[in-house]
Swiss-Prot record:
Function: Produces ATP from ADP in the presence of a proton gradient across the membrane.
Record's bilayer topology term: Peripheral membrane protein
Residues annotated with N-acetylthreonine modification: 2
GO molecular function, one term: mRNA binding
Organism: Arabidopsis thaliana
Assembly, per entry: F-type ATPases have 2 components, CF(1) - the catalytic core - and CF(0) - the membrane proton channel. CF(1) has five subunits: alpha(3), beta(3), gamma(1), delta(1), epsilon(1). CF(0) has three main subunits: a, b and c.
Chief location: plastid
Cellular component, GO, one term: proton-transporting ATP synthase complex
Keyword Ion transport: yes
Protein name: ATP synthase epsilon chain, chloroplastic
UniProt-listed CDD domains: F1-ATPase_delta (cd12152)
Amino acid sequence: MTLNLCVLTPNRIVWDSEVKEIILSTNSGQIGVLANHAPIATAVDIGILKIRLANQWLTMALMGGFARIGNNEITILVNDAEKNSDIDPQEAQQTLEIAEANLRKAEGKRQTIEANLALRRARTRVEALNTI
């Protein structure tokens, strides 16, 4: 049995195809979804989406949003998403280093929160390259 997975951002459809299984980062931890999963709506955290096709796993960096699962349909709406194959390793590493530097020099609560979020996004992109 398969699931139909659709990953959407405000600007584009990132993925729309059948899959065997996914592992999704939610605000309360990771969940695995197979065919005939119980219906659920959940917040999606900044993190990795693992997608299993027949015998192959793919990864995607997700930048927060929400997901709806039901009737073997998974719709994930996120602020941004990148397949690991679309991420430039050098650019991702450079962005991570900049985010770490910005966090070190952040002043005040607002700057610190924004710098932490940027760092989480940068780490997720690097992690997507190194997962599976």
